[in-house]
Structure formats: structure tokens, C-alpha cells
Amino acid sequence: MQKLKQQVFEANMDLPRYGLVTFTWGNVSAIDRERGLVVIKPSGIAYESMKAADMVVVDMSGKVVEGEYRPSSDTATHLELYRRYPSLGGIVHTHSTHATAWAQAGLAIPALGTTHADYFFGDIPCTRGLSEEEVQGEYELNTGKVIIETLGNAEPLHTPGIVVYQHGPFAWGKDAHDAVHNAVVMEEVAKMAWIARSINPQLNHIDSYLMNKHFMRKHGPNAYYGQK
């Protein structure tokens, strides 16, 4: 697990480096599917003092199997998403400014241009609000459930992120670094959408044929963007 702990540590350290977190906000995890174990950031530990050895290993029920700290308070959300979506290898949660602003507004981040379409096939959805019962009960587990409810049967890697109403963004990917990459992009396109709609409140979504082209040339079966 040392290699995965190092990867998760590095991915967590990328959050302040890319300006996605303040203080101890945010967390990144990754899963070892063969062993059924998840590595995640410890709860409330400052990034400046954090080490790879501090990463916490939990099983799929959330039981700590390695580590001296409590795991992130959002662990149950991560585990619920891993259980539902076998294609996920890494998950990140932040309170990055612009993506969180869309979450607080209760609005999906609209697909307005090709930067968005290069990574997200359509709008980045916003969940419904959790009920008082859901919040007072198993809050973090229910956060995962409302994300799954919103995504439905969609392929999560085609829309590798979501904003949870009145909370903030979650993003995911093939591994921890890919998840952070998608979280960085989500914050950037959230900012772009806010600026664009401020300039032109009547701005329409990106044309579907242009969105399809940009997404498929990077992620489709005949993708040709980048190097083999």
C-alpha cells in the first residue's frame, strides 16, 4: 500500500498547490480494487505538516486497517461512490471558490465552451438538497447517495464531477491524480461560466455538435488528441 499512499499524499498536496483548498479543507482518496482498500487523507491535518505515512487506509466498510489518525470525515461519501462505480480509481472533494458558488446557488455548471467540453460531456450537475432527516442521519453516506441519485446510470468518467447543493464539488477519475486534474478543470470552467454569464446573461450552451467533437476527440473510441 506504500505506493498508493504516496500517490494519495501527492494528490492531496496538489490541492493547495492549485489553489483548490484553504486551511485543511478538501480530501483526496484512491482505491486498491484487488484488495478492497481505500487510502484517504486524515481528518483535519494541516497540509504543511502532512506526510505520506499519515494517509489512512480503510476497508470498504470504513474500518481503519492502517494509520494512526481518523480518516477524512467525508470517507463514507467516497466509499459509497467507489461501491457504485467500478470505473472510479480516485475521488477528490474541495470547497474551491467558483465551483462551490454554483453549488450554493443550486445550479449546474453550464457547458458554454470547448474548455468545458474537453472534459465534461454536458453540464456539471448539481444535486438536490438533502432533507433534514438525511443530514441528521448518516450525512456523509447520504451525500454519496444523492450524488449517485443525480448521476443515475450515466458513465461517471464522462462527467467526472458534480456539485452538491449548498456544499461543494466532488470530482473523480481513473486514479487520484486524474481526479485532482478534473477538480482543477471544474474550478476553471466554473469560473469561466460565471464570467461569461456575467458578460452575457442570455448566453446559450455550447452547440451540441461542437461539444461532441471536443469530448470525443479526447475520450471517444477514435480519440486522436495527444500522443499514444
Curated annotation (Swiss-Prot):
<feature type="active site" description="Proton donor/acceptor">
    <location>
        <position position="118"/>
    </location>
</feature>
<dbReference type="GO" id="GO:0016832">
    <property type="term" value="F:aldehyde-lyase activity"/>
</dbReference>
<keyword id="KW-0479">Metal-binding</keyword>
<dbReference type="GO" id="GO:0005829">
    <property type="term" value="C:cytosol"/>
</dbReference>
<dbReference type="GO" id="GO:0019854">
    <property type="term" value="P:L-ascorbic acid catabolic process"/>
</dbReference>
<feature type="binding site">
    <location>
        <begin position="72"/>
        <end position="73"/>
    </location>
    <ligand>
        <name>substrate</name>
    </ligand>
</feature>
<feature type="binding site">
    <location>
        <begin position="26"/>
        <end position="27"/>
    </location>
    <ligand>
        <name>substrate</name>
    </ligand>
</feature>
<feature type="binding site">
    <location>
        <position position="167"/>
    </location>
    <ligand>
        <name>Zn(2+)</name>
    </ligand>
</feature>
<comment type="pathway">
    <text>Cofactor degradation; L-ascorbate degradation; D-xylulose 5-phosphate from L-ascorbate: step 4/4.</text>
</comment>
<keyword id="KW-0862">Zinc</keyword>
<dbReference type="InterPro" id="IPR036409">
    <property type="entry name" value="Aldolase_II/adducin_N_sf"/>
</dbReference>
<dbReference type="InterPro" id="IPR023499">
    <property type="entry name" value="UlaF"/>
</dbReference>
<dbReference type="GO" id="GO:0008742">
    <property type="term" value="F:L-ribulose-phosphate 4-epimerase activity"/>
</dbReference>
<comment type="function">
    <text>Catalyzes the isomerization of L-ribulose 5-phosphate to D-xylulose 5-phosphate. Is involved in the anaerobic L-ascorbate utilization.</text>
</comment>
<feature type="binding site">
    <location>
        <position position="74"/>
    </location>
    <ligand>
        <name>Zn(2+)</name>
    </ligand>
</feature>
<dbReference type="InterPro" id="IPR001303">
    <property type="entry name" value="Aldolase_II/adducin_N"/>
</dbReference>
<feature type="binding site">
    <location>
        <position position="93"/>
    </location>
    <ligand>
        <name>Zn(2+)</name>
    </ligand>
</feature>
<keyword id="KW-0413">Isomerase</keyword>
<dbReference type="GO" id="GO:0008270">
    <property type="term" value="F:zinc ion binding"/>
</dbReference>
<dbReference type="Pfam" id="PF00596">
    <property type="entry name" value="Aldolase_II"/>
</dbReference>
<feature type="binding site">
    <location>
        <begin position="43"/>
        <end position="44"/>
    </location>
    <ligand>
        <name>substrate</name>
    </ligand>
</feature>
<feature type="active site" description="Proton donor/acceptor">
    <location>
        <position position="225"/>
    </location>
</feature>
<keyword id="KW-0119">Carbohydrate metabolism</keyword>
<protein>
    <recommendedName>
        <fullName>L-ribulose-5-phosphate 4-epimerase UlaF</fullName>
        <ecNumber>5.1.3.4</ecNumber>
    </recommendedName>
</protein>
<dbReference type="GO" id="GO:0019323">
    <property type="term" value="P:pentose catabolic process"/>
</dbReference>
<feature type="binding site">
    <location>
        <position position="95"/>
    </location>
    <ligand>
        <name>Zn(2+)</name>
    </ligand>
</feature>
<comment type="similarity">
    <text>Belongs to the aldolase class II family. AraD/FucA subfamily.</text>
</comment>
<dbReference type="InterPro" id="IPR050197">
    <property type="entry name" value="Aldolase_class_II_sugar_metab"/>
</dbReference>
